[in-house]
Amino acid sequence: MLKVLQQIPPENGHILHCYSAGSQFLDDFIQTGALISIAGNVTFKNNSSNVKEAATRVPASRLLVETDSPYLAPAPKRGRINTPNFIVYTYTEVARLRGIDVEDLAEQVRKNFSGLFSN
């Protein structure tokens, strides 16, 4: 996928949904104009180190947060059917990892999302 995006970059940007590829590819994807979307698996205690690292390394201007409903319900709701109501847990964890307020994260994500779809 990276090679295709590098050869034929989308004109209006694109989203990498539920990013989990790890930091070794992060900069390359960002250079293609991608917004990196972090899902509920960032809250998992096991098997989320790639996602946690990505959540801290994505430039603020390239970050999105998503539910991935009905899948990947965040802790403490893991194992349930995910709903948009659970997004607060994902935002809380991403904000904690980045050392910022949840409100500031939410405002940045709103700007990023609006910027992508206003073109």
PLM feature spans:
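Conserved short-loop catalytic and cofactor-binding motifs
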Residues: A39-V42, A75-R78, E93
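A general structural signal for short secondary-structure boundary/capping elements
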Residues: A60-D68, Q108-G115
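Residues at secondary-structure transition points
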Residues: S20, K45-S49, R78-N85, I100
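Ser/Thr-centric signal marking residues that sit
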Residues: T43, T67, T90
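Divalent metal-coordination and catalytic microenvironments
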Residues: H17, F29, D68, L105, ...
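Catalytic pocket-lining loop regions of alpha/beta-barrel enzymes
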Residues: M1-L64
